[in-house]
């Protein structure tokens, strides 16, 4: 009963010896090893979550949550207010300028955010809208909240166009107050932020902004119902997503002086921490 019987016959064919192979101890050892691996994996997972959780709490304690652009009280002027050739719409960079000045062109020609509204006009989006019982995806608030700068009508300037997609102010905040002051001779980044500019240069605030659509928040969330209607699965990793989007800024000495600088490992860790916090907020 404790193993597998093995029978041996002697040369004369009369004597035989029955032995039992000790299989139970071997099986028990394998089970113990498996449990050990499981315990180790569990320990590593708990440790990782504890570390990330600690990072979350540290950053949340140090940084007050700013209002996201969708919920700010500022006037949103639209892309046209930024796209002048002497502002951010130059075809090429200006060598003696403190900024590149071709930011709009980079966004328009290379950034997927510029095409976010157009996605709502695709056959797939139309099918998703139909499955949800909506007339059109490009007019539905639950779609526009993340595929455009869908601020209330009373916060839209006459030059504002929904079809601009995830435009300048969807990430940088309504420019109603800072559009004039940010080019003044005595302008400072601190004052621009005080006038409504969103701090996308800070990894914590950038992660919170990106996750509000690429995962969801209290204002907008890709629910199970939307996923069931055919919406693609959501995924996000701050450092990778930041690196994949064409930069419309240059991290030079002036940038580091005004805004600081973060390496990829730091941005990745902060992104993971903020993603965990966002998931916990959704669960709780």
Protein language model regions, located:
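Boundary at the C-terminal end of the N-terminal hydrophobic targeting segment
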Residues: 60-64, 76
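Cys/His-coordinated zinc-binding microdomains
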Residues: 86-88, 147, 172, 214
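Cysteine-centered motifs
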Residues: 8-10, 60
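Post-signal peptide N-terminal segment of secreted/secretory-pathway proteins
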Residues: 130-169
